[in-house]
From Swiss-Prot:
Its EC number is 6.3.1.1. It comes from Bacteroides thetaiotaomicron (strain ATCC 29148 / DSM 2079 / JCM 5827 / CCUG 10774 / NCTC 10582 / VPI-5482 / E50). Keywords: Amino-acid biosynthesis, Asparagine biosynthesis, ATP-binding, Cytoplasm, Ligase, Nucleotide-binding. Pathway: Amino-acid biosynthesis; L-asparagine biosynthesis; L-asparagine from L-aspartate (ammonia route): step 1/1. This is Aspartate--ammonia ligase. The keyword Transferase does not apply. The lineage of its organism: Bacteria, Pseudomonadati, Bacteroidota, Bacteroidia, Bacteroidales.
Length: 345
């Protein structure tokens, strides 16, 4: 079901022309900073991949990819990507990228099963990035170093926005707070996972939650994660499982946390087998991507995605992602948004 958060007394700080210019400036500035911080080269990415190769991202395992037959390939099915998590690792191998360097790309996707609302659209645009690492880098301290580099690019971008539009005051804390999902559960034992995120983000402003996908002490997961890209079972922070996580910010306009990025150290052979077994998904080992990983023809890597529209929405203090990108929305949502001074593109 669709949803609509209705912020009180919302007034856009920028008109439509300023918003479009701001989007352009943010995207250009941030990707240059991201590239230099992580030593990433831009590459061209696919909008769709062949079905049955194990390349598409399964997200939480329940979302249906948009698919279509290809006439010239005997009606073989292609799938619009959900993300490029596994494709990027194949590309690192194809480009023979050295450790310490990587790639980034503009990822465009269609997620037809999204519950549409302020933060969720049918259309997903993000910077997908992947960097080659060594076995010695497969630890939580290295993960935190990479996260802090990305956050540094976010801080600089926020100041650029302030220079261009002085009415938009910087609000990001200088330091990002790290916490494991199990520690977060123990901190707020009576709250559901999403409410825990809101509580911790309201307190610190910017938070990275480590260990997304691993089972917590209550037998549940903080959130789902496909078992074949992020390593969420190897020992990490404070001897707790997980070398991955989500970066979240407190949004003053919506008065809630927003997830801007998911990232992590990727599975090696052992972690892949362990996580597939845990999820009863060992059949996937027969797929092309998984065979490549098991044959040691893919490099060890770290990677993630950063939401472009959400990042722009945060910087420009917008109440709805539809103020940043063009998409399809329920007619009743469009009418309500107009009444609230939320102008959907």
């Amino acid at each position: 079901m669709s949803y609509l958060i209705k912020p009180k007394n919302y007034k856009p700080l920028l008109d439509l022309k300023q918003t479009e210019l701001g989007i352009k400036q943010i995207k250009e500035f941030f990707q240059l900073n991201l590239s230099s911080e992580l030593r990433l080269r831009r590459v061209t990415a696919p909008l769709f991949v062949l079905k049955g190769m194990g390349i598409n991202d399964d997200l939480n395992g329940i979302e249906r990819p948009v698919s279509f037959p290809i006439k010239d390939l005997g009606d073989a099915q292609a799938e619009v990507v959900h993300s490029l998590a596994k494709w990027k690792r194949l590309t690192l191998a194809d480009y023979n990228i050295e450790p310490g360097y990587g790639i980034y790309t503009d990822m465009n996707a269609i997620r037809s099963d999204e519950e549409l609302g302020n933060l969720h659209s049918l259309y997903v645009d993000q910077w997908d990035w992947e960097r080659v690492i060594t076995n010695e880098d497969r630890n939580v301290e290295f993960l935190k170093e990479i996260v802090n580099r990305i956050y540094a690019a976010m801080i600089r971008t926020e100041y650029m926005v302030y220079e261009m539009y002085p009415q938009i005051k910087p609000c990001l804390p200088q330091k990002l707070h790290f916490i494991h999902s199990e520690e977060l559960r123990q901190l707020y034992p009576n709250l559901e996972p999403k409410c825990r995120e809101h509580a911790i983000c309201q307190k610190y402003g910017a938070v990275f939650i480590i260990g997304i996908g691993c089972k917590l002490s209550d037998g549940k997961k903080h959130d789902g994660r496909a078992p074949d890209y992020d390593d969420y079972t190897s020992t990490g922070l404070n001897n707790l499982p997980g070398l991955n996580g989500d970066l979240l910010l407190w949004d003053d306009v919506l008065q809630r946390s927003i997830e801007l990025s998911s990232m992590g150290v990727r599975v090696d052979r052992e972690a892949l087998q362990r996580q597939l077994k845990e999820e009863n998904e060992e059949e996937r080992l027969k797929l092309y991507f998984h065979k490549r990983l098991m044959d040691d023809t893919l490099p060890l890597s770290i990677g993630g995605g950063i939401g472009q529209s959400r990042l722009c929405m945060f910087y420009l203090r917008k109440a709805h992602i539809g103020e940043i990108q063009a998409s399809i929305w329920p007619e009743d949502m469009r009418k309500e948004c107009e009444e609230l001074d939320i102008h959907l593109i």
